[in-house]
């Protein structure tokens, strides 16, 4: 069992397999040029898996594959099969923008993937184009349909932005409602890589939009999930809200993150990280385990953000979320 320095059990590992992405979303990497970390700097699937076996043997029972856009990494289904074959009962999920799902969903399902989290910020082609800086909506919707068709579990993530897609909160939720998909609204996470002019919506503002049409009741958090859940009285539909400016989900945080280059990150909102790359490249499991132990010991008690409006002196993450699957 993995225990951090504050007594929390860590049983969830998020693994980024690439920083590359085929979108240029305004809240993530709008001005990132199409230049990338050289392939030789990335850990191979075998090297990533070497560390992941250590984590699974020590009690990790949930793994999420992220990016960038993980479906851009060649032979991803083979990597997923490696994980599934080693521990068939592991909760194995993937976060994606769904653009490549029409041609990959079946292979992912066959390899052992169980669930997907998919970003869907708009149902209007022109707004989706504005956010992603690419004509994406038609292909994304096809990807969602294909995932459902092959039997993958699907959740939708939406980041409401003032003046851009804030008038679509109900539309996107009802799209999910019609398909029996859970949606989680995510407060925009300030970071130095995003478009400076962006303004996100506070959780209370998001809920007020839902309340314009529906009566909602708070359900609370489910386990260690950062999502606070609500139910709609009129039809029993359940949705979630992820509000990272609060600290109330930090007390039950159960996750660590591994980047494609081998950096082990204790918290998404901290810049500190230690590398396991040298250890796994030489097959030194003991050294990799020692790095893991240090990261767990130093895992922070809570994030550095503050609830409410961003104020002078408040932390703005310099972490590139496309490197860590933010």
UniProtKB/Swiss-Prot annotation:
Binding site for [4Fe-4S] cluster 1: 21, 25, 28
Binding site for GTP: 14, 64, 95, 155, 255-257
Organism superkingdom: Bacteria
Amino acids binding [4Fe-4S] cluster 2: 250, 253, 267
Gene Ontology BP annotations: Mo-molybdopterin cofactor biosynthetic process
Family annotation (SUPFAM superfamilies): Radical SAM enzymes
E.C. number: 4.1.99.22
Cofactor: [4Fe-4S] cluster
Binding positions for S-adenosyl-L-methionine per the UniProt entry: 27, 68, 119, 189
Catalyzed reaction equations: GTP + AH2 + S-adenosyl-L-methionine = (8S)-3',8-cyclo-7,8-dihydroguanosine 5'-triphosphate + 5'-deoxyadenosine + L-methionine + A + H(+)
Pathway membership: Cofactor biosynthesis; molybdopterin biosynthesis
Family matches, as Gene3D superfamilies: Aldolase class I
UniProt xrefs under InterPro entries: Aldolase_TIM (IPR013785), Elp3/MiaA/NifB-like_rSAM (IPR006638), MoaA (IPR013483), MoaA_NifB_PqqE_Fe-S-bd_CS (IPR000385), MoaA_twitch (IPR010505), MoCo_biosynth_MoaA/MoaC (IPR050105), rSAM (IPR007197)
The record's free-text note on cofactor binding: Binds 2 [4Fe-4S] clusters. Binds 1 [4Fe-4S] cluster coordinated with 3 cysteines and an exchangeable S-adenosyl-L-methionine and 1 [4Fe-4S] cluster coordinated with 3 cysteines and the GTP-derived substrate.
PROSITE patterns xrefs: MOAA_NIFB_PQQE (PS01305), RADICAL_SAM (PS51918)
EC class: lyase
GO molecular-function terms, A-Z: 4 iron, 4 sulfur cluster binding; cyclic pyranopterin monophosphate synthase activity; GTP 3',8'-cyclase activity; GTP binding; metal ion binding; S-adenosyl-L-methionine binding
Subunit architecture: Monomer and homodimer.
Function description: Catalyzes the cyclization of GTP to (8S)-3',8-cyclo-7,8-dihydroguanosine 5'-triphosphate.
Sequence similarity: Belongs to the radical SAM superfamily. MoaA family.
Entry protein name: GTP 3',8-cyclase
Protein species of origin: Sulfurovum sp. (strain NBC37-1)
Gene field: moaA
């Amino acid at each position: 069992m993995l225990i951090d320095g504050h007594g929390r059990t860590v049983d969830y590992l998020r693994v980024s397999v690439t920083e590359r992405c085929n979108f240029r979303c305004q809240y993530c990497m709008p001005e990132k040029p199409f230049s990338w970390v050289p392939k030789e700097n990335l850990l191979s699937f075998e090297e990533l898996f070497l560390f992941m076996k250590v984590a699974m043997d020590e009690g990790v029972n949930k793994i999420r594959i992220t990016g960038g856009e993980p479906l851009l990494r060649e032979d991803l289904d083979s990597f997923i099969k490696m994980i599934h074959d080693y521990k068939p009962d592991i909760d194995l999920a993937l976060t994606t923008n769904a653009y490549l799902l029409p041609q990959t969903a079946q292979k992912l399902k066959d390899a052992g993937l169980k669930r997907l989290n998919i970003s869907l910020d708009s149902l209007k082609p022109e707004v989706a184009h504005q956010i992603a800086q690419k004509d994406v909506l038609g292909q994304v919707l096809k990807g969602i349909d294909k995932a459902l068709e092959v039997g993958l579990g699907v959740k939708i993530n939406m980041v409401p932005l003032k003046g851009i897609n804030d008038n679509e909160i109900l539309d996107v939720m009802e799209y999910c409602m019609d398909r029996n998909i859970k949606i989680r609204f995510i407060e925009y996470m300030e970071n130095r890589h995003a478009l400076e002019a962006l303004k996100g919506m506070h959780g209370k503002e998001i809920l007020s939009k839902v309340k314009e049409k529906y009566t909602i009741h708070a359900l609370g958090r489910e386990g260690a999930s950062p999502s606070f859940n609500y139910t709609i009285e009129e039809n029993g539909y359940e949705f979630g809200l992820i509000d990272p400016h609060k600290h109330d989900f930090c007390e039950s945080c159960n996750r660590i993150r591994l980047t494609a280059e081998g950096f082990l990150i204790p918290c998404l909102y901290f810049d500190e990280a230690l590398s396991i790359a040298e250890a796994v490249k030489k097959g030194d499991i003991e050294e990799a385990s020692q790095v893991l132990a240090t990261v767990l010991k130093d895992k922070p008690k809570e994030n550095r953000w503050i609830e409410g409006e961003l104020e002078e002196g408040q932390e703005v993450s310099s972490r590139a979320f496309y490197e860590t699957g933010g």
